[in-house]
Design a protein with these regions (language model features):
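N-terminal cationic amphipathic segment used for targeting or macromolecule association
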Residues: 40, 56, 112, 195, ...
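Short coil/turn segments at secondary-structure junctions
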Residues: 29, 102, 133-137, 166-170, ...
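Surface-exposed polar/charged interaction patches
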Residues: 28, 32, 44-48, 65-68, ...
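Alpha-helical oligomerization segments
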Residues: 156, 160-229
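Short acidic DE-rich linear segments
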Residues: 1-5, 136, 223-229
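Long amphipathic alpha-helical segments with strong coiled-coil/leucine-zipper propensity
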Residues: 60-149
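Extended, helix-rich scaffolding/adaptor regions
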Residues: 1-97
């Protein structure tokens, strides 16, 4: 993902520090500067962005729907979400329609970012239909969605900067390196113990996702200190 049309870069001091740390990483390309770049990026993201709100809403709906499938079955859950029109549709069509609904058809940059993150998480967990979603581990799903969101957010903010003076292949390699670092930090340490508190009747719990997202930011910030011990 490059910088989207209409995207306005944040101007808070935390983002200035993040930009400097990314510049240092691009010059040095060592483990320490990479860890600091991710840490400063996570710190800047933790100050609050509209993209996080859109993602939390969409991911909360996905989690609630998945839990509903396991406890109430497909048709009842579709009815609870106001989607009786999808009853009888093919499982892959149902999943695509819900993803479109939960992300407002990618109407804004924030919605598009959420859609990219959810789609990436589904691919990572081999979820291609509502049937697959019914059997997924909710902890794994939440962790993958959050990891994908942070990675795509990094791309949104820094793809263009990283690509300056570099080939597409070089840019991809650098971003992949960052993505792997973030994934490694989160997959071992992010344990969403609050997942069982999702309230199906609320049609998703954005507050839960938001809380877990901030836990993820903290892990990424702390991972820099751990890597220097």
């Amino acid at each position: 993902m490059g910088t989207s049309k209409g995207y306005i870069a944040p101007t808070r001091p935390e983002w200035s520090a993040s930009k400097r740390s990314v510049s240092t990483f691009l010059r040095n390309r060592d483990t320490d500067s990479k860890a600091k770049a991710v840490s400063k990026f996570a710190e800047a993201m933790s100050t609050g962005t509209s993209s996080a709100s859109a993602f939390s809403s969409a991911a909360g709906n996905v989690l609630a729907f998945a839990k509903g499938l396991a406890t109430n079955g497909l048709n009842n859950t579709l009815s609870l979400f106001g989607r009786d029109d999808l009853i009888g549709k093919k499982p892959d069509e149902i999943l695509n329609a819900l993803l479109d609904q939960f992300t407002n058809s990618g109407a804004t940059i924030e919605d598009s970012l959420a859609a990219d993150a959810l789609s990436s998480a589904f691919d990572e967990l081999n979820i291609s239909s509502s049937d697959d979603l019914a059997h997924v581990d909710l902890n794994d799903l939440l962790r993958e969605m959050i990891t994908a969101f942070i990675n795509f957010s990094f791309d949104l903010h820094y793809h263009e900067k990283i690509g300056q003076g570099r080939t597409p292949a070089e840019t991809k390699d650098i971003l992949t390196d960052i993505h792997k670092y973030i994934a490694n930090a989160l997959h071992d340490k992010l344990t969403p113990a609050e997942i069982g508190k999702i309230n199906l009747s609320s049609l998703g719990d954005a507050a839960l996702v938001s809380s877990m997202l901030h836990d993820a930011y903290s892990i990424c910030m702390d991972f820099y200190g751990d890597s220097n011990k």
